[in-house]
Amino acid sequence: MLSYQQPDASGHFGRYGGSFASETLTHALTELREAYARYQNDPEFLKEFHSELAHFVGRPSPIYHAARMSREMGGAQIFLKREDLNHTGAHKINNVIGQAMLARRMGKPRVIAETGAGQHGVATATICARYGLECVVYMGAEDVKRQSPNVYRMKLLGATVVPVESGSRTLKDALNEAMRDWVANVDNTFYIIGTVAGPHPYPMMVRDFQSVIGTECLAQMPGMLAGQRIAAEHPDAVIACVGGGSNAMGIFHPYIPHEKTRLIGVEAAGEGLDSGKHSASLQRGSAGVLHGNRTFILQDENGQITETHSISAGLDYPGVGPEHAWLQEIGRAEYVGITDREALDAFHYLCRTEGIIPALESSHAVAYAMQLARTLRTDQSILVNLSGRGDKDIGTVADLSGVDFYDRPSMRGHAVKGGPAA
C-alpha cells in the first residue's frame, strides 16, 4: 500500500497549496488552524459530527449497482455512490456541518459562503437555520439565473443571497466577494468554503470532512462486489467530477493507499478542450496562485485569470484544489475531460435507464464511466461518485432541449384557500 501523508505542517501538497492571503486575514487563518487542530480528533466533536451525519443528513449514503446501464455498456459493472440522496441533495452538507460546528465553538455568529451550482449555498443556509447563525451567500449573477430554484431555497431557509455582477459573474467572482466580506468582518464572521481550495487549512479541512464518502465506500464495496460475484474488495476505478474538487477528494482520499484502484477526476471540457471554452484547469492550466493557494489555474500569458465555461455551474471555476494538482503530479490520479454535449447525453441516459436524475456536475462523471466501462471486462468494476441530484438543473436541461419548462397554467395571483386544520 502507498504511504501518503499530506499536507505538511504549512499546508503544502508538494509544491502546491500553502497560504497566500492578505495580512488582514492572517489572524483569522491562524485562529482557524488552531481551532481545527484542537477539534479534529476531539472525541466529543467527532461524536457530534457523526451523529449529525447520521440523523440530519441520513448517512451512510447507499451504493447502487446500475445494472441496466452496466448491461447496456457491455463491460465493467458500474456502481453509484448516492450522495444525491443526502439531505439538501448533494455531498456539500458533509463539509458544511463540520465547519458550522467549528464556527459555533469559535463564537462566530455570522457565516458567509460562496456558491456556484447553489448546492453549497443551500447546505450552508440549511445548517445556519438549524444552528441559529446569520447566513450570507455570494453567488455569481450568471449562476443566480441558471440556478434559480436553489436561490429560492436559500431564501426560504433565511439566507441573504448576494448576486455578484463583477467579472464573469460566476463562481470565481462569488469567491472573490466572499473573501472581501471576510476581510471586512473578520471578528464576527466564519467563512465556510465549499471546496478543497483556499488558504490552509481549508483544502485539508474540507477534504477531511468529505472523506466520510470514501470511508463508507471502503466498507460497502466488498459486499457490493461479492453480490455481483466479483472477486475483489475494491473497484478497479473510482470516478468523480472535478471543479474545485471536494466530492472527488472526499471519495479519492481513503482510496489513495490502494494503488490498484485508479482514481479518475473528470473536468468540464465545455465546448472542447481546444475551444477555449472549458473549465479544465488540470489539463489546460498552469501553476499559479488563486484564492489563497498555489495550484493549477486557467490564466493567460500575463497571469490574468481567463474566463471559463461549463454547462454546469458547479464546475465553472478556473482553478482546482491543490491536492488534485499534487495527485496528478505524482501520478496517483488521472484527469480527463467531458464536454457539455457528452454530459447532457449522460444526464438523459441515466434518467431513462436507471430512474435517477443526476446533477449536471455528476453527469460528467457518469459520462466518462460509460466510456470507460466499454473498455473493461464484465468482472471489473467502476465506482462513480454521484455527487448530487439534478432537480436544480431541469430548467437548464429543458432550455437546452428546446422544451418550455413553464408550459402550464399560471398559479400567480391565485389565493391559497382554507384555514387551520380542524
Swiss-Prot record:
GO molecular function, one term: tryptophan synthase activity
GO cellular component: cytoplasm
Cofactor(s) listed: pyridoxal 5'-phosphate
A Pfam family matched in the record: PALP
Family indicated by similarity: Belongs to the TrpB family.
Function as written in the Swiss-Prot or TrEMBL entry: The beta subunit is responsible for the synthesis of L-tryptophan from indole and L-serine.
Subunit (UniProt): Tetramer of two alpha and two beta chains.
Full protein name: Tryptophan synthase beta chain
